UniProtKB/Swiss-Prot annotation:
It is found in: Cytoplasm. This is Endoribonuclease YbeY. SUPFAM superfamilies: Metalloproteases ('zincins'), catalytic domain. Its cofactor is Zn(2+). It comes from the Bacteria. It comes from Salinibacter ruber (strain DSM 13855 / M31). The gene is ybeY. Zn(2+) binds at residues 121, 125, 131. Pfam families: YbeY (PF02130).
Length: 157
């Protein structure tokens, strides 16, 4: 009997009351992966809450504040510079659905679209994009908009 391998994508709904459609999540993720010219080796996507994301932010990054998404590469060595790495995405993305629920009105969008933006943002980090500087922030925002507009209905005004 051949060995069993884990699926390249696992989605965990770990929020007590909020969730996103798994089919749409898979579609958004696959679009980003294809557009970036990479593949999924293994991605664990966890949809969770403020407490979990803040605890991870403190434990692993030594940041004592809330954030909307955290990405952790499971690859050895430095992350790729940006764009296709050729190795495939291998990592974990934690999305704070509470932040999406609290902030979506601020950006005149739906809760779902804001949460999908966090998913795309986390993937872009795993591909190698960096938003530590304003130019990187602008590039990532441009990519997020491009990918969301390609796969999701236009936001209502």
């Amino acid at each position: 009997m051949p060995p069993e391998y884990p699926e390249p994508l696992s989605i965990e709904h770990d929020h007590p009351s909020r969730e996103l459609d798994a089919g749409t999540l898979r579609y958004v993720i696959q679009h980003v992966v294809d557009a970036e010219g990479t593949s999924l080796t293994h991605l664990s996507l966890v949809l969770t809450d403020h407490d979990t994301v803040r605890r991870l932010n403190q434990s692993y990054l030594d940041h004592d504040y809330d954030t909307d998404v955290l990405s952790f590469s499971l690859r050895e060595g430095p992350a790729p510079s940006s764009g296709a790495s050729g190795e495939g995405i291998e990592g974990e993305v934690y999305v704070d659905l509470d932040t999406a629920a609290e902030r979506h009105d601020e950006f005149d969008t739906s809760f779902e679209r804001e949460a999908y933006r966090y998913v795309v943002h986390g993937l872009l980090h795993l591909v190698g994009y960096d938003d530590a500087q304003p130019a990187g922030q602008d590039k990532m925002r441009e990519k997020e908009d491009q990918y969301l507009n390609a796969v999701l209905p236009a936001p209502s005004s």
